[in-house]
UniProtKB/Swiss-Prot annotation:
The keyword Hydrolase applies. NCBIfam families: dCTP_deam. Homotrimer. This is dCTP deaminase. The active site is at residue 133. It comes from Chloroflexus aggregans (strain MD-66 / DSM 9485). Its EC number is 3.5.4.13.
Length: 186
C-alpha cells in the first residue's frame, strides 16, 4: 500500500471532492501548520469542542456513554484540563475512495507539548467530518487552537478494491457531521 503524493491528493480533492474545503499548500506562518504536504494533508480542527469532565462521577462505558460527561465549548481555543481529554471535529469533510485507507497521526508541535491525538483509520468509502480525540498527558492545562492544524492524514492506496467498503456495510459513523459520541449497533 504505497502512500500517495501531494499531486494525487490535490487531483483527488479538486476533481473528486475528497477533501472540502481544500488548501492546496501548507500554511505555516504564525499557526500550527495545515494544508497539503508532500505525502499527506494536515487537517484543521473547528472551534467546537467537547471537554471531558467527571461532574457526575460517571463510569466511562462506550456501550452506555453519558453525554453529560462533556462540557460543550465553542471558542478560538480550548484549554484541556490536566490528564484529561477533549473531542473535536475536523474542519474538512473527507470522502475516501474505495481503494484507499487513511491513517491520521498527530502534529509534532502538539506532541512535543504532551498533547496526543487519536483517530481511527478512515476506511474505504467512508465520508464525513473526522471526530478527533485530543489527550492532554501533562499535569498542566493544555491549549488547542481552533482553525489550525491538528493531525496529518496519510492516504494509502491498495493494489485492488476491497470486497466490502465502509459504505457497503453501512458503517455507523458514515456521513457524520459535528462531534459524534460513541455508538454501538443494537
Amino acid at each position: 500500500m504505497p502512500v500517495k503524493s501531494d499531486r494525487w491528493i490535490r487531483r483527488m480533492a479538486l476533481e473528486h471532492g475528497m477533501i472540502e474545503p481544500f488548501v492546496d499548500h501548507q500554511v505555516r506562518k504564525g499557526v500550527i501548520s495545515y494544508g497539503l504536504t508532500s505525502y499527506g494533508y494536515d487537517m484543521r480542527v473547528t472551534n467546537h469542542f467537547k471537554v471531558f469532565t467527571n461532574v457526575y462521577n460517571a463510569l466511562v462505558d462506550p456501550k452506555k456513554f453519558d453525554p453529560r460527561s462533556f462540557v460543550d465549548i465553542e471558542a478560538d481555543y480550548v484549554d484541556i484540563p490536566p490528564n484529561s481529554f477533549a473531542l473535536a471535529q475536523s474542519l474538512e469533510y473527507f470522502r475516501i475512495p474505495r481503494t484507499v485507507s487513511c491513517i491520521v497521526i498527530g502534529k509534532s508541535s502538539y506532541a512535543r507539548c504532551g498533547i496526543i491525538i487519536n483517530v481511527t483509520p478512515l476506511e474505504p468509502e467512508w465520508e464525513g467530518h473526522v471526530t478527533i480525540e485530543i489527550s492532554n498527558t501533562t499535569p498542566l492545562p493544555a491549549r488547542i487552537y481552533a482553525h489550525e492544524g491538528i493531525g496529518q492524514v496519510l492516504f494509502l492506496e491498495s493494489d485492488e478494491p476491497c470486497e466490502v467498503s465502509y459504505a457497503d456495510k453501512k458503517g455507523k459513523y458514515q456521513g457524520q457531521t459535528g462531534i459524534v459520541l460513541p455508538r454501538i449497533d443494537p
